[in-house]
A protein has these predicted regions:
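Acidic active-site catalytic centers that drive phospho-/nucleotidyl reactions
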Residues: 6, 44, 102, 120
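Short, well-structured N-terminal submotif of metal-dependent ribonuclease cores
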Residues: 1-38, 53-65, 121, 125
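Generic structural signal for small/hydrophobic residues in well-ordered secondary structure
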Residues: 7-8, 45, 85, 109
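Active-site neighborhoods of divalent-metal-dependent phosphate/nucleic-acid chemistry enzymes
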Residues: 57, 69-119
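Charged phosphate-binding loop/patch that engages nucleotide di/tri-phosphates or the phosphate backbone
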Residues: 111, 115-117, 121-134
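General small-molecule cofactor/ligand-binding pocket signal
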Residues: 36, 75, 132
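Residue-level signal for well-ordered alpha-helical positions
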Residues: 16-17, 48-51, 88, 129-130
Length: 134
């Protein structure tokens, strides 16, 4: 199965953070799965690290190096991914989800027929079977 990992999932995995549950670690470690990261995550990390290096110690380059060293596959940003954001539908009465990085990565997963692994409750409120909530 193909899994696109949300940025925080990757950070937790790289740092050994216990917030990443065993089920998620097992999916990532399972060699029958293809593990992907988005170029969107590299952008998100670089923007957030540059703005607040005291809150996010990893920069985009180190993040990218970790992904490549582990053999994760990069998902580039395509026009189709961007334009499909308009088609995202929230569940009834779900509060707004304003994170543009998350929305773009969810669209990448949908367009590329992947599961989007996340811990974010707001992402799980989209009407799609692409979300793999951990």
């Amino acid at each position: 199965m193909k899994f696109l990992l949300d940025t925080h999932i990757l950070i937790w995995f790289f740092s050994g953070d216990e917030q990443l549950i065993q089920r998620a670690r097992a999916v990532i470690a399972d060699e029958s799965n293809e593990i992907y990261y988005s170029l969107t995550s590299v952008l998100e990390i670089e923007i957030k690290h540059t703005a607040h290096p005291d809150r996010l110690s990893i920069d985009g380059e180190r993040f990218l190096n970790h992904c490549q060293r582990l053999g994760f596959i990069q998902v580039p940003i395509k026009t189709e991914h961007i334009l499909s954001i308009r088609n995202l539908v929230r569940k009834e009465n779900a509060p707004p989800h304003r994170d543009p990085f998350d929305r773009l990565m969810l669209c990448q997963a949908i367009v590329e027929d992947m599961k989007f692994m996340t811990h974010d409750e707001r992402i799980a409120e989209y009407v799609t079977d692409a979300v793999y909530k951990v």
